[in-house]
């Protein structure tokens, strides 16, 4: 296991049990109903007098069969076209009247593995509004009307969305997903579906998807805001109890893993509409097992990745500032790729001038190889440590200013990924300890395990225009081979460590112009007359 190997080289590994779960924040009320539905409730007054209401369905487009492509997203639309208790457009009309505007505050989103419905900034001054918001979550769980005439009416809306979405950026995203999810179901799901399928699917196909996957054991309700936690919990328990539990033989979600590839998978997508040239290099690896996400192991894993990306991005920024830089900008990431839950990656990306992708690719591949061979220096590590500590200190200092949406996202992630949801004090203590405890040898050991020459995916997106020459797959492979066999020097850390003003230097002062006392603060303000180098 990657994190175990990295942890083994830290000097303070015996100070605590890395398999210990991270305790949950006691200010969030959680529970599971008999039908399997999970809930999270928290009182928060940022902003005062408002609350966010969410329901997460832990299913999405990847649960579609071939004849249902696009129907997870279609179903999301239907949730706003009539439910058991709010037929027709009553749902949106009511929420608009109380200030919850469609698009800004009332919305939903369909992904490959999740579908989320949300009402944000809902006023909580009247109990009736809270009751109505919970009733809407109830209907979104299991009581969407799916009236035949509404389904047929919505076909045109979604086909228009397909048309407007089908731009160069979306097409390039789909090409990237096809490369990353090659030989899996992810290669063949585009979220919105295809024109012929949207025109001709039978109503029963949509109903079948709905009945199979919209069920409480794959659902979490989240309410965060200026509410009475006890009262909301009682309302949820009462209101959601009529949602039926799934049958014992109900279908279970399939865990989809991406197969290894020995040779690089290369995707080159050019488009006359594309703005800018970009090349991405992914080094795939399995995601950390979900059961480890809530352990100290998982948090340490994240901190090590933060060290690695912080140091490498500093190197890439240093290169980009040179007059002859091979790219306009570059970056490195490590961890989730945001689409396939079972897949993580070490990712390098470069944005270049049009026609300069080959040079950009050689540069980022060289930097990747440099990290693999030599790792990072102690000086780089110390600067990264200071940076990470500043971030942790800033988060802790702002702990009382967290808005509803930040808490909501934490709880959604806890439900879908088993990531931790500690209180601010626990998070600060754990992160500050790990930042200080981890050493450069641990980060370098980790880097060697997640950077290698197999399981690579190379994705090129660039304009298709006369005069712009983009690299072929063969040329990219040749660059890769060239760098892999090249003699590469280790990174030289030339950062100035000495103070800008040597110790003991006597500086010539400026005359004092005026002083001012502040009795309240007990301070003295001093203004200087700054001398100019030249008088005219």
PLM regions: where:
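Structured mid-domain segments that build the active-site/substrate or prosthetic-cofactor binding neighborhood
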Residues: 298-377
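Scaffold signal of the M16-like zinc-metallopeptidase fold and its non-catalytic homologs
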Residues: 81-83, 108, 112-113, 129, ...
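Proteolytic maturation boundary segments
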Residues: 14-41, 228-305, 309-317, 321-323, ...
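Buried hydrophobic packing residues in well-ordered domains
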Residues: 36, 55, 73, 117, ...
């Amino acid at each position: 296991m990657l994190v175990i190997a990295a942890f083994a080289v830290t000097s303070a590994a015996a100070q605590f049990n890395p398999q210990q779960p991270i305790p949950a924040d006691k200010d969030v009320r959680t529970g599971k109903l008999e039908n399997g539905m999970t809930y999270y409730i928290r009182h928060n007054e940022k902003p005062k007098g408002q609350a966010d209401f969410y329901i997460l369905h832990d299913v999405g487009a990847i649960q579609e069969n071939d004849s249902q492509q696009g129907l997870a997203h279609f179903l999301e639309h239907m949730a706003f076209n009539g439910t058991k208790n709010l037929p027709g457009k009553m749902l949106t009309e009511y929420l608009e009247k109380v200030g919850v505007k469609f698009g800004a505050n009332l919305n939903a989103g369909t992904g490959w593995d999740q579908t989320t419905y949300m009402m944000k900034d809902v006023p909580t001054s009247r109990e009736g509004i809270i009751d109505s918001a919970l009733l809407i979550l109830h209907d979104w769980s299991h009581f969407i009307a799916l009236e035949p005439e509404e389904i047929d009416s919505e076909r045109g809306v979604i086909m228009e969305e397909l048309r407007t979405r089908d731009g160069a950026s979306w097409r390039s995203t789909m090409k990237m997903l096809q490369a990353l999810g090659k030989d899996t179901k992810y290669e063949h799901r585009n979220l919105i579906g295809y024109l012929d399928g949207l025109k001709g699917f039978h109503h029963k196909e949509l109903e079948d998807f709905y009945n199979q996957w919209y069920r409480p054991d794959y659902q979490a309700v989240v309410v965060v805001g200026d509410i009475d936690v006890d009262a909301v919990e009682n309302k949820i328990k009462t209101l959601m109890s009529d949602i039926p539990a799934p049958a014992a033989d109900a279908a279970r979600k399939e865990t989809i893993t991406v197969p290894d590839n020995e040779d690089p998978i290369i995707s080159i997508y050019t488009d006359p509409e594309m703005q800018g040239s970009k090349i991405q290099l992914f080094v795939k690896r399995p995601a950390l097992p979900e059961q480890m996400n809530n352990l100290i192991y998982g948090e340490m894993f994240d901190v090590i990745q933060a060290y690695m990306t912080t140091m490498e991005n500093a190197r890439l920024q240093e290169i980009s500032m040179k007059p002859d830089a091979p790219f306009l900008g570059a970056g490195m990431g490590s961890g989730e790729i945001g689409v396939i839950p079972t897949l993580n990656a070490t990712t390098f990306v470069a944005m270049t001038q049009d026609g300069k992708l080959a040079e950009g690719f050689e540069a980022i591949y060289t930097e990747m190889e440099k990290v693999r061979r030599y790792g990072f220096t102690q000086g780089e590590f110390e600067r990264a440590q200071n940076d990470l500590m500043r971030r942790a200190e800033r988060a802790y200092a702002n702990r009382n200013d967290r808005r509803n949406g930040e808490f909501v996202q934490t709880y959604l992630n806890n439900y879908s990924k088993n990531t931790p949801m500690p209180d601010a004090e626990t998070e600060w203590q754990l992160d500050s300890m790990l930042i200080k405890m981890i050493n450069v040898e641990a980060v370098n050991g980790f880097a060697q395990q997640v950077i290698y020459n197999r399981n690579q995916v190379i994705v090129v997106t660039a304009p298709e225009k006369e005069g712009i020459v983009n690299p072929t797959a063969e040329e990219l492979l040749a660059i890769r081979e060239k760098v892999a066999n090249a003699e590469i020097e280790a990174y030289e850390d030339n950062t100035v460590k000495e103070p800008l003003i040597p110790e003991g230097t006597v500086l010539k002062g400026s005359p004092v112009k005026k002083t001012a006392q502040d009795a309240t603060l007990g301070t003295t303000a001093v203004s200087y007359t700054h001398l100019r180098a030249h008088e005219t």
